[in-house]
Amino acid sequence: MTEKFNLQDRFLNMLRTGKIEVKVYLVNGFQTKGIIRSFDSYTILLESENQQNLIYKHAISTIMPSSFVRLVKKEEEEQEGQTESATNKTQ
């Protein structure tokens, strides 16, 4: 059985493991920045300058990483390209 692709978890995990600084914009207009130390289904633990913030996901509007994050590995991109071209040929 193939693994289900969870975009949110993969994105947050890449930010966490890469220790990539992010800006987090909240729905109330507040913004903060730091490094994601952990996350679960409902919260994100953000660390900045020896301070920790536990932010509820429902309060987040946008997460902007300071650098580009590649979510799909090269092999997966090539496999998807082959699947798409095969699908286009049959149509």
Curated annotation (Swiss-Prot):
SUPFAM superfamilies: Sm-like ribonucleoproteins. It holds the Pfam family Hfq. The keyword RNA-binding applies. Transmembrane segments: none annotated. Keywords: RNA-binding, Stress response. GO terms for cellular component: cytosol. InterPro entries: Hfq, LSM_dom_sf, Sm. Residues 9-69 form the Sm domain. CDD domains: Hfq (cd01716). One of its GO terms (biological process) is regulation of translation, ncRNA-mediated. The keyword RNA-binding applies. It comes from the Bacteria. GO terms for molecular function: RNA binding. Belongs to the Hfq family. Homohexamer. HAMAP family: Hfq (MF_00436). RNA chaperone that binds small regulatory RNA (sRNAs) and mRNAs to facilitate mRNA translational regulation in response to envelope stress, environmental stress and changes in metabolite concentrations. Also binds with high specificity to tRNAs. This is RNA-binding protein Hfq. It comes from Pseudothermotoga lettingae (strain ATCC BAA-301 / DSM 14385 / NBRC 107922 / TMO) (Thermotoga lettingae).
